[in-house]
Structure formats: structure tokens, C-alpha cells
Amino acid sequence: GSPLRSPRDGIGVKHAILSKHERNRFSMKELKGACIIGQSGGPTSVINASAYGAIKTALENECITNVYGACNGIKGVLDDHLIDMGKEDPDELAYMKYTPSSALGSCRYKLKDPDVDDTDYKRILEIFKKYDVRYFFYNGGNDSMDTCNKISKFMLKNGYECRVMGIPKTIDNDLAGTDHCPGYASAAKYIATSVMEIYHDARVYDTGMITVIEIMGRNAGWLTASAALASVKGCGPDLIYLPEVPFDMNSFMEKVQKIYDTNGEVIEVLTGPSVIDELNKRALAYKETQNGYEPLPNEAEGEAIADYSGNPDDYAN
């Protein structure tokens, strides 16, 4: 049998060795009340599947009296714009499992520090009391988890018992405490497919080509790293640069030149504002000609880079 299971009754060993007092200490008392579920941040292919799981389970839980969906995330709570999910057709709700985007609507609204301005928090508490909300689920990424943290602390400070839970969702895959977030896998698949398509597009020309693919991800390189999946089909990038690794322009240029001299083309994938900024500056040092790009004279190159503001429009033309 598994070393994590008791051969006698299947109870996990960790659970079995806890005393009755310890088990009671970790268990929560029964709490009855309504539940609000909301979504925020960028939608993904699977965020609705997570929301559906929470909605369905809440509707079946005897401790939860009503289940409400917040329209457009926390703004729906602030505006008292809630949907009674118990009145929805269960068969229609089940379609959420396979429906992309955010079924309840989303927002990019960030709550302020309650020590600076607690207006929103007082309004949230007012709505919670109005509907006797004792459970709040928020489905999103880092900002959504920050919202959960702030609301939970405010409710605790004001003596209102409410269990606040974050449901992870981010294609960046950068939420602490998660191995892989819902949304990352589908985004990784999309990136790998896109890199394979770019690989084939870049090979059709009779002149050499250097292709730079910029991928989002804030300061996390999970999405960028997923481009390596294209290598399984022999269409992967030549170079991958992650924001977690310091970027050296000279080393980068040497590697690009070496691969270009060998293969006649280069595909590189990267992310991170510092990397992109360096490449944008370098791009200004060239002018477009009939046969491609040629370096500017040293004096003109210096002026172009000095005038660079960090705006992509500076070099787009």
C-alpha cells in the first residue's frame, strides 16, 4: 500500500497520528450564511471551470443559504449588483465548465489600503450584512488575492465572521503556494503553437531573418519558458531569455551572431521590461534600407538612443 495511507482503514497517516485535541484545533466550526463568488483580472480559457466548481459546491452545501455571483468582480459587490445563482438553470450553469472568458464579468479595481481609505471596505461590510454573507470567494490572480487578504483582515478587525477564500487563476503562473495555476497550461499551449507557426513563417524568405518574440509575464518567466515546448516538434526557438536571469546585451549579441552565421536565421523568445528596453535602444541604432537595415553612423546612433523615451512608438517608424 501507499506509505501515505494506513493499511487498516485508509486514513492518511498524518491525520491518524494527530490527537483528538489537535484535530479539533485545526477544524472550523459550522458557519451558516450566504456566499458571494466573483471573478477579476484577465480572463482565461478555464477560469469559468473554477468558478463553476465553487458555485456548484456552494449550492449543494447545507451551511450556505444563498449563492450570489458578483457582476464584474468586487465592483459588483460595491454596486450591489449581484445575481442569485440558485435561480439559474443548473444545465445552463454546467456550460461554464467549457466556456472561456469570465462568465460573471471582470474588473481591474484595486482596493486601497484600509488604513488610508476604508470607504470601500465599509461598503463591502454593509453589503455582506445585508445578505448575511459569511463566505466570499474571489477568482483571480495576484491582485485578486491581495483583495482577499485585505477584505479578510478588515472583517476580522471589525468582528464580522466571514471566510474569505481566493481561487487561483493566472496565466503568468506566479501565485505563491501553487504548483501550476489554472489558465497557465492553456496559455503555454498557445505560446508553443505560436512559436511553431513563427518558425515556419521565418523560413520562407531567401534572406536571413532574426525574429524576436516578446511574451508577457511581468517578472515571471513561466510563459516565456513554455516556448521551449515547440522544440518537441523541432520548431523551437534558438534562444530563450527569462526575467529571473540577469540580461547581458553583449553576450546576447554574440550568441545571436553565432547562430545567425551558422543557420542564417535566429528565433529568440524573451520577456521582462529591462530586456525589451535594451533591445528597443539597439533598434534605434539602425535605419531601414531597400535591402533591410543598416547601422547608423556613430553620432546619429548616439542621438537616437539619447532621445529614446521608453515608448515603443519612438522606433516603430
Positions of the model-derived regions?
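Catalytic or ion-translocation cores adjacent to nucleophile or general acid/base/metal-coordination motifs
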Residues: 57, 62-65, 72, 166-170, ...
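Accessory alpha-helical/coil subdomains and C-terminal extensions
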Residues: 127, 135-140, 146-161, 165, ...
